[in-house]
């Protein structure tokens, strides 16, 4: 449900078309993450992080480690709760647009998609 809402929102706001659920690696080939949406043109990751899958003790540790890998690689990340996507899509749209502009204002991080797009 949340990913369907995210896809609908991304089409509606007309940013570059994101790639969905692709694996991102750094220049050494080390896996950084698998964002729900990846805006390859600017190196922006969008994660739809539900409490059910990210806030158990081990899940939370993995989420923090993932976010640290994104930061170390220079990737800007937008994190959205599914409930916020459902209840406040306009606010989420504004955040995505601003984040896309912010990412575009900097050199694209030296990362690549390691799965076919």
Predicted regions span which residues?
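Surface segments flanking catalytic/ligand-binding clefts of nucleic-acid enzymes
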Residues: 1-117
């Amino acid at each position: 449900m949340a990913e369907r809402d995210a896809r609908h929102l991304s089409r509606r706001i007309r940013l570059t078309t994101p790639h969905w659920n692709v694996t991102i690696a750094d220049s050494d080939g080390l896996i950084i993450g698998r964002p729900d949406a990846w805006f390859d043109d600017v190196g922006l990751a969008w994660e739809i992080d539900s409490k059910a899958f990210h806030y158990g003790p081990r899940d939370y540790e993995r989420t923090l480690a993932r976010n640290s890998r994104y930061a170390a690689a220079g990737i800007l990340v937008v994190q959205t709760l599914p409930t916020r996507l459902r209840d406040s899509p306009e606010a989420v749209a504004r955040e995505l647009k601003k984040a896309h502009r912010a990412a575009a204002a900097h050199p694209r991080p030296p990362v690549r998609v390691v799965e076919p797009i």
